[in-house]
Amino acid sequence: MINWYKTPKLVQRMFPKRVWTFPKETNAVFLTFDDGPIPNITPWVIQELKKYDAKATFFCIGENIKKHPDIFKTLISEGHSTGNHTNNHLNGWKTNVSEYVKNVILSEAEANKWNEKSKIKNPQSTITNHQSLFRPPYGKITTKQSKILQKRGCKIIMWDILSADYNTSISEEKCLQNVLKSIVPGSIIVFHDSVKAEKNLRYTLPKVLDFISKKGWDCKKISLG
């Protein structure tokens, strides 16, 4: 993970085809959760979001979808967006282009298995976002990998605020302040529904949701529409 709590504007300008923020005029913030679905953690996140009628985007690892399809199904049924986070949480800077792209496609396939079964019961069901929204693990992806995925129709979703909830060396309060000191309408915020991040996440997320609510901002999922 690239450890800027607030992504510098210069970095955002260097990669203009990647999505870093949304217009402030949306009056909304965009919470995102990487690395799930994980039992006990992802379901807890879903329940916390529901308390505020908040929607979010979950960048899922393919192997975790395979292990926990019921949780993945719940994400969709609760109205959240899902996106691709590779099949095995690959570091793009350490993976050749062919292997990286194949791993992304494997993750798509895991999501599509659920989608095809779901359509039998509900013809309107769709997880098109999962196939088209992509976040590189650690924020690390090469220019060539990026171009190939974009040609396949992927939107590469980055962020402007990193909670660093996964960092066990920082305090829960530091994690919270990483978010609160920089959040504005249009912000894309990174959390992790992972075992490693659980302690900081359970402390921080309810307080962030309360802060957003008191500001009168919406909490929206990222979608293609």
What do the PLM-derived regions correspond to, one by one?
Residues I46-K55, H80-S81, V97-T143, K147-K151, ...:
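CE4/NodB-like, metal-dependent polysaccharide N-deacetylase domain
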Residues K73, V97-V104, S171-Q177, R202-P206:
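Charged helix-capping and loop-helix junction motifs
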Residues F15-E25, K51-D53, N64-K66, K199-G225:
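C-terminal domain-boundary segment and adjacent tail
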Residues K140-L180, G216-L224:
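His/Asp/Glu-enriched short active-site or ligand-binding loop at hydrolase and phosphoryl-transfer sites
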Residues F33-D35, C60-G62, N84-T86, P136-Y138, ...:
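A cross-domain feature marking catalytic cores of carbohydrate-active enzymes
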Residues W4-W93, Q131:
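Active-site beta->alpha N-cap acidic-glycine motif
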Residues G36-N40, C60-H68, L90-S98, R135-T142, ...:
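Acidic-and-aromatic substrate-binding clefts and catalytic sites of carbohydrate-active enzymes
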